[in-house]
Regions:
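Short, flexible turn/loop "capping" segments at secondary-structure junctions
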Residues: 29-30, 131
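Conserved hydrophobic/aromatic beta-strand scaffold that supports enzyme active sites
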Residues: 28, 70, 101-103
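Cyclic nucleotide-binding regulatory module and flanking cytosolic helices
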Residues: 1-27, 82
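Conserved short-loop catalytic and cofactor-binding motifs
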Residues: 6, 41, 138
Length: 155
């Protein structure tokens, strides 16, 4: 879980003892190609960090499958709104290849605030960072061709 620890410490300045306590809340899981991590319509109970592999966030609209997001190594993935509110997921999240993740349940995630006293501030900063990445991807989608987006993302 060293890679999760390094990633977490990039965003959250905490002592090693607190960081180790937070990291211990995550479970390492292996997903096979095509395996669903979160299914649209289910209560969203987990958030994951992608250690290795590629995951796809998608939905079906009018019979057409739509990809909303692709997460690769080093990204966190969930239906954030459903995870935070305890609601039903709007998305299906599927492993596109054999994938390794570190997963944390909603109940364990809520324990982080007891470990890191200023977690609400740190969490807000992290969500802002994630939102900025999303805004940049939307801009790329609007301003680049499909080929340019592919080359930018996978190179």
């Amino acid at each position: 879980m060293q890679d999760l620890k390094e990633q977490f410490s990039t965003y959250f300045d905490t002592g090693d003892d607190k960081l180790d306590s937070v990291i211990s809340l995550f479970d390492k899981k292996h997903l096979n190609k095509g395996q669903v991590f979160i299914r649209q319509g289910d209560i969203c109970k987990d958030l994951a960090f992608v250690k290795q592999g590629i995951m796809r966030v998608s939905t079906v609209i009018n019979g057409k499958e739509i990809t909303q997001w692709i997460a690769t190594k080093g990204y966190y993935i969930t239906d954030l709104a459903a995870f935070i509110t305890g609601g039903r997921s709007r998305w299906t999240i599927t492993a596109l290849n054999n994938t390794t993740i570190y997963s944390i349940s909603k109940s364990d995630y809520e324990q982080i605030g007891k470990i890191i006293p200023d977690w609400n501030i740190k969490e807000k900063q992290f969500i802002t960072h994630c939102f900025t990445i999303l805004e940049n991807r939307v801009l790329q989608f609007l301003s680049m061709t499909a080929e340019e987006r592919y080359l930018h993302y996978f190179n």
